[in-house]
């Protein structure tokens, strides 16, 4: 079954399967299923066309998903960088934005280590 351009895994519960769509987490998935009148434990393969259509309609009218959500996220980060605020500068320099330490750790954000040659020790005469 496809929702918002994403193939949902048929063997998973509806709540978990909906989280495969970018922009829908567990809480959103539960509220979508509740509004559609579908039990969260039902598997995607058990849903009929009418129920799938109800889910698609709810998502289309109330949620920003996939490309729209990603684009909005990128625009928000770009805005921070353009106005030159502290968070924008951290994004621009590829450093952690939320106050984490960087002397050690932060490898995920900073990337692989760039080795800098150390000073050579003077030899004794």
UniProtKB/Swiss-Prot annotation:
Pfam families: Ribosomal_S13. Keywords: Ribonucleoprotein, Ribosomal protein, RNA-binding, rRNA-binding, tRNA-binding. GO terms for cellular component: cytosol; small ribosomal subunit. Residues 107-125 have a biased composition (Basic residues). Transmembrane segments: none annotated. SUPFAM superfamilies: S13-like H2TH domain. GO terms for biological process: translation. GO terms for molecular function: rRNA binding; structural constituent of ribosome; tRNA binding. Residues 92-125 are annotated as: Disordered. The keyword Ribonucleoprotein applies. Belongs to the universal ribosomal protein uS13 family. Located at the top of the head of the 30S subunit, it contacts several helices of the 16S rRNA. In the 70S ribosome it contacts the 23S rRNA (bridge B1a) and protein L5 of the 50S subunit (bridge B1b), connecting the 2 subunits; these bridges are implicated in subunit movement. Contacts the tRNAs in the A and P-sites. Part of the 30S ribosomal subunit. Forms a loose heterodimer with protein S19. Forms two bridges to the 50S subunit in the 70S ribosome. This is Small ribosomal subunit protein uS13.
């Amino acid at each position: 079954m496809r929702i918002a351009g994403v193939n949902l895994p048929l063997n998973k519960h509806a709540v978990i399967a909906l989280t495969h769509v970018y922009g829908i987490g567990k809480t959103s998935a539960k509220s979508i299923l509740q509004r559609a009148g579908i039990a969260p434990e039902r598997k995607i393969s058990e849903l009929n066309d009418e129920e799938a259509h109800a889910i698609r309609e709810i998502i289309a009218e109330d949620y920003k998903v996939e490309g729209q959500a990603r684009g909005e996220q990128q625009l928000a980060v770009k805005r921070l960088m353009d106005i030159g605020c502290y968070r924008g500068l951290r994004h621009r320099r590829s450093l952690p934005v939320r106050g984490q330490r960087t002397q050690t750790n932060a490898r995920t954000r900073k990337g692989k280590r760039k080795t800098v040659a150390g000073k050579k020790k003077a030899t004794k005469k």
